[in-house]
Every structure is written in C-alpha cells, then in structure tokens.
Amino acid sequence: MKNTDTREVIMISIRLSTKNLQADYYPFILEPEARHLFLKELASHFTARTDLLDIQQHLDEILLTLDGQTESYTFALTLPRLISITLDTCNACGKNQQWFRSLSACIAMDAGLSRPIRLFISDTIPPIIQWTGLHADRVSTLTQEMAAGNSPSCLITHALYKRLSPSIQSKYATLYYIRHICCYCAEL
C-alpha cells in the first residue's frame, strides 16, 4: 500500500439501540433482522452517490467512510434527517410485523486524513478493510457514550466542525467534551 492512497475522509458511526415496547417480550432473534432492514434502507440513500468509500456493520454499529470532498460534508450533515426517515420506515415495518421493539440511533461524525489497509485472505472472501487514523475509534467511542444517554443523539467532532463554512458552523454552537473529544451539536 502506497502512502499516496492517503485521502481526506469523513467517518460516521451510527449506533443502533432498541427499546422494548412490551415488558414481557424478548425478541432476541429479531434484532439482527431489524439491523439488516435498517442497513438495507440506509444503503438506498447511497445508490446514486460516488463518495461512499466503505460501509461496515459491527453488531449494533454501522461505520460509514465518505470521501472528504466538499460536497460530502454537506451530504454528511443531512444524514441525521435521512437516518430519522430510515428509522421511521423500519419502526413502521416492525410494528406491522408485531416486533414490539423500536429502533433509535446515535450518530457521530469525524474528519481527517486516512488511508485504507486491505487484508486479503482468499479469492472467495472479500478483503478486510481497516482505515488508518483514529477517526473510526473516535466516532465509535462517541456513539457508545451517546447510547448511554450522556449527550445529544448527533455530534460532530472539532476536526469536522473546522472544515465547515462559518454559516454552517453557527448552527453547531453547543460544545461538548466527551472522553476528551471536543464535539459540537446543532442548537436544539
């Protein structure tokens, strides 16, 4: 892997959580189905986009890696609204199938330089991709803390904040420090 593969990226973590709507209902088998449905619906928002570099799901977390071109920042900031629409669709589907669960999500976004490291195992298994830098770790840490109810459900790091235009920065005026990570959220 050459150092020339280093590029500006936007790393986004979406951490899903479920809430029981009925006290005596324990649908352990349905949570993977709900996550699959969410991921399928989310992927539909990216079909016409060329800036999605990678998407990975790890149980209740989805990591998106977008190319850090200027228009990707604008799109990334619309993701909370798109995720809300996706959650509404999934929850309506779950209600129709009597899952008695509701999905919610926490979203964290970071930006910076990164490059993909590919691990090839065999010809039949797609390569495993890891991204250099701390961006995936930071957004994952943030959404883990957010899922515990310690902050708003959508945060951007200072690294992403400083790449935004002043007019957009003014919308993200509330400052948070979570695990020594400087973050902002939109005014409520």
Specify the residue positions occupied by each region the protein language model found.
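Short, conserved acidic/polar surface loops in the N-terminal third of protein domains
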Residues: 23-25, 117-122, 167
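Catalytic NTP-binding/metal-coordinating core of nucleotidyl cyclase/transferase enzymes
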Residues: 2-75
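Catalytic core of nucleotidyl cyclases, primarily class III adenylyl/guanylyl cyclases
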Residues: 50-72, 90-132
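Catalytic/regulatory signature loops of cyclic-dinucleotide turnover enzymes
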Residues: 111, 122, 132-162
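Short amphipathic alpha-helices in soluble, non-transmembrane regions
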Residues: 76-83
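Amphipathic alpha-helical regulatory segments at dimerization interfaces
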Residues: 41-45, 82, 89, 93-96, ...
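Intrinsically disordered, glycine/charged-rich C-terminal tails and inter-domain linkers
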Residues: 1, 146-188
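Short glycine-aspartate micro-motif
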Residues: 11-13, 104-108, 155
